[in-house]
Amino acid sequence: MLKVTTLTKAYGKKTVLDQISFSVQPGEIIGLVGENGAGKSTLLNILATLQKPTNGSIHLHDKLCQKEKQSIRKAIGYVPQDIAIWEEFTVEENMIFFEKLAWKKLEIKALRQLCLDMALDKWKEPVKTLSGGMKRKLNLAISLIHDPTLLLLDEPTVGIDLKSRKEIGAYLRELASAQGKMILYTSHDMDEIIHLCDRIICIGDDPFYEEILIDSGKEILSF
Ligand SMILES: Nc1ncnc2c1ncn2[C@@H]1O[C@H](COP(=O)(O)OP(=O)(O)OP(=O)(O)O)[C@@H](O)[C@H]1O
């Protein structure tokens, strides 16, 4: 379980995240929404242990993340907004490269299966020839190499076509329900958020998001 308690982040005098508390159970997909600059990426960065909170605590599987950073990182898969893969390498070479950096080792067959699971079959193609959607799928596959229990996805489907979005959504649902992964997911696509997520966290002062989600039937937490 992930437990976030009264988490606050300030940059100088500006408080971006103010006393945020929530928990995530295995198998849950949580949507994070809010206007540009509301603090969604900041929250994901803090959960990924890449930034320190100003106050508050985060526990993952009962371990305090601020204290046990190294072991906590093994349980986290993080896909930032910007695609971070080698353009000149093939899909296969990228997967092998990142497998070498991962703490858990996987056979090539298993690496390939990770890509196939999300309908990415261009194994021998250079990444520079892939579409944006395929690159996002590869980024996601890379984040899964070490079999994390917590997946943090910052706009994983931005700018990609409906079919690829549906494929990624279906795969995330499968990861949550079949493998019990906890997924935190940001998107500006409210239909996608409503369709995919079990619960939704609205960040920021603007009530706009809460208002348009109110009829979704989903549990909404606002901060
Ligand atoms: N290193 C930093 N120093 C100072 N301010 C920062 C820093 N990083 C982010 N901010 C500010 O914190 C606020 C939240 O930024 P963040 O990127 O988390 O928002 P976001 O909700 O992810 O936005 P978007 O939807 O545009 O991706 C913004 O006002 C941003 O300018």
Tell where the protein language model's regions lie, with residue ranges:
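Helix-to-loop junction immediately C-terminal to a conserved catalytic motif
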Residues: 48
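Helical segment within the ABC ATPase nucleotide-binding domain
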Residues: 166-178
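The feature captures the beta-strand-to-loop junction immediately N-terminal to the Walker
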Residues: 33-35
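Conserved ABC transporter NBD signature motif
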Residues: 56-64, 71-72
